[in-house]
Amino acid sequence: MTYVLLADAKRWVGRSDTDDDAEFTAALNGAERAIDRHCGQRFELDVSATARLFRVTDSCEADLGAQAAVIGNTAGMVVATDDDDDGTAETVWAAGDYYTLPLSGVGPDGRTGWPVNRLVAVGRSFPVGTRRPALQVTARWGWAATPEPVLLAERMLFAAWYQRRATMTGAGGFEGWFASAIRDDQAVTDLLAPYRTGTAIAGMA
């Protein structure tokens, strides 16, 4: 499922028929992939919790977001460390051993609903200087809800594509077109700017 529902996108361009639904869906998929690549992250939530490993360079803080990992649901989250560098995260941290950032889920844009992107150690220290990734976090990764600015950016990209679709042939190349559209539309670029991570695709300014 795309971030923007097909019915919502069609309302934006004044369409209510189903004649071009397949093409519209392909375009929305292309816009979504271009947004994900531009931002270096995806804006949906994993169905179930999975474990991920991280290298940590600061004994007090683990920057998950810098490694394209954010947590949209902390229910059942497990933090564990490999303290002896044997490849097994045998030390499970208690809830009081760390806290999460951003505080209260408030992001740099002042909006709530941002996912966890950093862990701050309180009762313990993160192992650093290890040969193996020393931090293991089990959680549901991603965003609990797609941010409204991202939804607006996708709607705007779809509307821009719709205006030009008569001059485009075939259903391929959507992602490349949308990548260029993001670069060329300052309003879209500004909407997505707060959501770019350090893993955003190089060259997608």
PLM segments and residue spans:
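Divalent metal-cofactor coordination and adjacent catalytic microenvironments
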Residues: M1-A205
